[in-house]
């Protein structure tokens, strides 16, 4: 669970827009991710979903089972070192260009339009064929 270590790393920060939350149901969680500026996690699923929302992700692990996200630049491995996590998060929070350069990266998992493409193909098949 990443909540306790992150709360310790950022214990000196009191900011109205920083939230340390308990696990949420899926839809409220996606809503929170969409409204977030930066996501810090140890979840493999979030590493896959956050790029669809255009959110940079710091992963509190030393390895990931999502190498395509690492190669694309949609995630950064920061491990569990307090200073490394703080420094990388600060870089995203303090440098607008760095943030933009690292949040406007193409999603390595696709553009989210697969369903529409499949529906178009199915729609083009004549009935009864």
Where are these regions (language model features)?
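Nucleotide-activated sugar donor-binding and catalytic core shared by glycosyltransferases
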Residues: 2-129
């Amino acid at each position: 669970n990443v909540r306790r270590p992150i709360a310790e790393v950022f214990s000196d920060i009191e900011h109205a827009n920083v939230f340390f939350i308990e696990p949420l149901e899926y839809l409220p969680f996606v809503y929170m991710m969409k409204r977030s500026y930066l996501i810090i996690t140890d979840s493999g699923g979030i590493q896959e979903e956050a790029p669809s929302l255009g959110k940079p992700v710091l992963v509190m692990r030393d390895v990931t089972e999502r190498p395509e996200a690492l190669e694309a630049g949609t995630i950064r491995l920061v491990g569990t070192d307090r200073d490394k996590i703080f420094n990388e998060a600060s870089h995203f929070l303090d440098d607008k260009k760095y943030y933009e350069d690292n949040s406007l990266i193409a999603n390595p998992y696709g553009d989210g339009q697969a369903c529409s493409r499949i529906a178009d193909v199915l729609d083009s098949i004549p009935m009864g064929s």
